[in-house]
Amino acid sequence: MLQPKRMKFRKMHKGRNRGFAAGSTVAFGTYGLKAVGRGRMTARQIEAARRAMTRHVKRQGKIWIRVFPDKPITEKPLEVRQGKGKGNVEYWVCQIQPGRVLYEMEGVPENLAREAFELAAAKLPFKTTFVTRTVM
């Protein structure tokens, strides 16, 4: 699963997930999966969606993951009283704003890419849409 190799600080404040996304255009592949809603995507969700896409296209073409989970989420153990410091890092997330391209794909027909992205979207906690690369 994805997580940073090293960080300056182990734990982070919760923060807010406002604004609009950087990385809102298809940059590498021909087709993309773009977030319509906002939320946070765990490293497990990123991997589950990637596996679903890879299996559906039978390892043809190329897939790019455009997001990286760089925010640690801490949790205190069950039945532990409040206080005594912040909990341990349990998992990593990536904060997603509307317009962010999550995955890209090339080297497969459009209908196959659409189906693969639908399978991936079912694994994610927010709404997504299929986009194609625009040539300028």
UniProtKB/Swiss-Prot annotation:
<keyword id="KW-0699">rRNA-binding</keyword>
<dbReference type="GO" id="GO:0003735">
    <property type="term" value="F:structural constituent of ribosome"/>
</dbReference>
<dbReference type="GO" id="GO:0019843">
    <property type="term" value="F:rRNA binding"/>
</dbReference>
<dbReference type="InterPro" id="IPR000114">
    <property type="entry name" value="Ribosomal_uL16_bact-type"/>
</dbReference>
<dbReference type="InterPro" id="IPR016180">
    <property type="entry name" value="Ribosomal_uL16_dom"/>
</dbReference>
<dbReference type="GO" id="GO:0006412">
    <property type="term" value="P:translation"/>
</dbReference>
<keyword id="KW-0689">Ribosomal protein</keyword>
<keyword id="KW-0694">RNA-binding</keyword>
<dbReference type="GO" id="GO:0000049">
    <property type="term" value="F:tRNA binding"/>
</dbReference>
<comment type="similarity">
    <text>Belongs to the universal ribosomal protein uL16 family.</text>
</comment>
<comment type="subunit">
    <text>Part of the 50S ribosomal subunit.</text>
</comment>
<keyword id="KW-0820">tRNA-binding</keyword>
<comment type="function">
    <text>Binds 23S rRNA and is also seen to make contacts with the A and possibly P site tRNAs.</text>
</comment>
<dbReference type="InterPro" id="IPR036920">
    <property type="entry name" value="Ribosomal_uL16_sf"/>
</dbReference>
<dbReference type="Pfam" id="PF00252">
    <property type="entry name" value="Ribosomal_L16"/>
</dbReference>
<dbReference type="GO" id="GO:0022625">
    <property type="term" value="C:cytosolic large ribosomal subunit"/>
</dbReference>
<dbReference type="InterPro" id="IPR020798">
    <property type="entry name" value="Ribosomal_uL16_CS"/>
</dbReference>
<protein>
    <recommendedName>
        <fullName>Large ribosomal subunit protein uL16</fullName>
    </recommendedName>
</protein>
<dbReference type="InterPro" id="IPR047873">
    <property type="entry name" value="Ribosomal_uL16"/>
</dbReference>
<keyword id="KW-0687">Ribonucleoprotein</keyword>
